[in-house]
């Protein structure tokens, strides 16, 4: 999922689509590996998108040199909370910082691989 998708509301839209199909569903979210807060550097325009979309997130952006670092986990949690998902677990792993286990386009450039996710329904 790209950063503009996350800021653009794809998390909220996905939850709303699930609830449209199963209105009484109890959702649990798991935040998987992603680029860590200290390593996700963006320009002011991207930082401002997050500030505007989620003004209640405290500490989700910090200045670093001439750039800004964005805490993707904090904003994903805010997006989930916005649509009523409160049961959220976060693995806390950074794809950028953990080169032994994860690919990172930002770290490795063109030498990339793939990540996978599992989603299921329990009845």
Label every model-predicted segment.
Residues 3-123:
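Active-site microenvironment for binding and transforming phosphate-containing groups
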């Amino acid at each position: 999922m790209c950063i503009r998708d996350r800021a653009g509301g794809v998390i909220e839209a996905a939850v709303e689509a699930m609830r449209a199909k199963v209105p009484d569903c109890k959702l649990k979210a798991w935040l998987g590996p992603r680029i860590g807060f200290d390593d996700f550097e963006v320009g002011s325009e991207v930082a401002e998108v997050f500030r505007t979309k989620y003004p209640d997130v405290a500490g989700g952006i910090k200045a670093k040199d001439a750039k800004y670092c964005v805490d993707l986990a904090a904003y994903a949690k805010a997006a989930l909370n916005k649509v009523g998902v409160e049961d959220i677990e976060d693995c806390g792993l950074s794809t950028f910082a953990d080169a032994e286990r994860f690919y990172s386009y930002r770290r490795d450039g063109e030498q990339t691989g793939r990540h996978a996710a599992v989603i299921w329904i329990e009845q």
